[in-house]
Swiss-Prot record:
CDD domains according to UniProt: mandelate_racemase (cd03321)
Phylogenetic lineage: Bacteria, Pseudomonadati, Pseudomonadota, Gammaproteobacteria, Pseudomonadales
Binding site for Mg(2+): 195, 221, 247
Pfam family, one: MR_MLE_N
Family affiliation: Belongs to the mandelate racemase/muconate lactonizing enzyme family.
Pathway the protein takes part in: Aromatic compound metabolism; (R)-mandelate degradation; benzoate from (R)-mandelate: step 1/4
Organism of this sequence: Pseudomonas putida
Protein name, UniProt field: Mandelate racemase
Name of the gene: mdlA
PROSITE patterns in the cross-refs: MR_MLE_1, MR_MLE_2
InterPro entries, sorted: Enolase-like_C_sf (IPR036849), Enolase-like_N (IPR029017), Enolase_C-like (IPR029065), Mandel_Rmase/mucon_lact_enz_CS (IPR018110), Mandelate_racemase (IPR015654), Mandelate_racemase_C (IPR013342), Mandelate_racemase_N_dom (IPR013341), RHMD-like (IPR046945)
An MF annotation (GO) of this entry: magnesium ion binding
Gene3D superfamilies xrefs: Enolase-like C-terminal domain, Enolase-like, N-terminal domain
């Protein structure tokens, strides 16, 4: 096979609706501002990926970064690891972090998708693993007692064996009321994860988490500011229940710092922020060496492939950011994600829908 080159990069900014707004203790995400990426190759295949900007304020900047990076990658070989190394070097003075790192991850994910298509194999098999069901939890919001309970019951009826609910209400009693109501509705053999979204200081996090661990929660996620690894370590040291973090690690190097000081007993990198497929591979090796169970954050389509190839795979987060513009090739059965038997990641754009949400 002759060398496959990158021949073009197209980006489209969209702002798509969510089935439920994502309410958190620190704010609400009402829509999903996404950058859709198409990476064309000399083999005739096109790799697809998308990025989540979190806020519409950052959407155009993220798209522009990708557009400006196009000239750096066109006519380069379709070799994701080498592309990542080149971009890391090009941006070392500006700082290979933040939106720059996120944009580079979008290129990486699209390149791996294209590589799978070139070899006519799903990404999971390209990574050397077999496709298998990946256990998933249904990810919810700061919904209040009634809606949180209703959504948990619905998830259980759909076959899920765990849910995550966001907490961080004004009073601890409110956090406990939500967890207790869910527990009463779904029973003891059902996982309940809780997420504070960085909303507490360390003393408050210790106090609330010590109360919550008596309720049998599976983990307590980001109880304090995500960059405060020492604070997380102090919280974890006072608890039996695992602290979960990682969605804001910008690259495996941040994961290494957190794990090295015992900031958490569970890890959940975000496929975008950790550095795409290339960053995830490195992160999964760290998790294996530290003996840390590793879950995913958002990006459920590609994360299913990645977790199936992760030695310490734990849970996939089911939260459908892009369902308005992506065909539902990733399915869920009996609480598990079922990887599609399609080349690459399996992302297929719903082109007729994309036009409705272009920014």
């Amino acid at each position: 096979m002759s060398e496959v080159l990158i021949t073009g990069l197209r980006t489209r900014a969209v702002n798509v609706p969510l089935a439920y707004p994502v309410h958190t203790a620190v704010g609400t995400v009402g829509t999903a501002p996404l950058v859709l990426i198409d990476l064309a190759t000399s083999a005739g295949v096109v790799g697809h990926s998308y990025l989540f900007a979190y806020t519409p304020v950052a959407l155009k900047s993220l798209k522009q970064l990708l557009d400006d990076m196009a000239a750096m990658i066109v006519n380069e070989p379709l070799a994701p690891v080498s592309l990542e190394a080149m971009l890391a070097k090009r941006f070392c003075l500006a700082g290979y972090t933040g939106l720059i790192r996120m944009a580079a991850a979008g290129i990486d994910m699209a390149a791996w998708d294209a590589l799978g298509k070139v070899h006519e194999t799903p990404l999971v098999k390209l990574l050397g693993a077999n496709a298998r069901p990946v256990q998933a939890y249904d990810s919810h919001s700061l919904d209040g007692v009634k809606l949180a309970t209703e959504r948990a019951v619905t998830a259980a009826e759909l076959g899920f064996r765990a849910v995550k609910t966001k907490i961080g209400y004004p009073a601890l009693d409110q956090d406990l009321a939500v967890v207790r109501s869910i527990r009463q509705a779904v029973g003891d053999d059902f996982g309940i994860m809780v997420d504070y979204n960085q909303s507490l200081d360390v003393p408050a996090a210790i106090k609330r988490s010590q109360a919550l661990q008596q309720e049998g929660v599976t983990w307590i996620e980001e109880p304090t500011l995500q960059h405060d690894y020492e604070g997380h370590q102090r919280i974890q040291s006072k608890l039996n229940v695992p602290v979960q973090m990682g969605e804001n690690w910008l690259g495996p190097e941040e994961m290494f710092k957190a794990l090295s000081i015992g900031a958490c007993r569970l890890a959940m990198p975000d496929a975008m922020k950790i550095g795409g497929v290339t960053g995830w591979i490195r992160a999964s090796a760290l998790a294996q060496q530290f003996g840390i169970p590793m879950s995913s954050h958002l990006f459920q389509e590609i994360s299913a492939h990645l977790l199936a190839a992760t030695p310490t795979a734990h849970w996939l987060e089911r939260l459908d950011l892009a369902g308005s513009v992506i065909e539902p090739t990733l399915t869920f059965e009996g609480g598990n994600a079922v990887i599609p038997d399609l080349p690459g990641v399996g992302i297929i754009w719903r082109e007729k829908e994309i036009g409705k949400y272009l920014v």
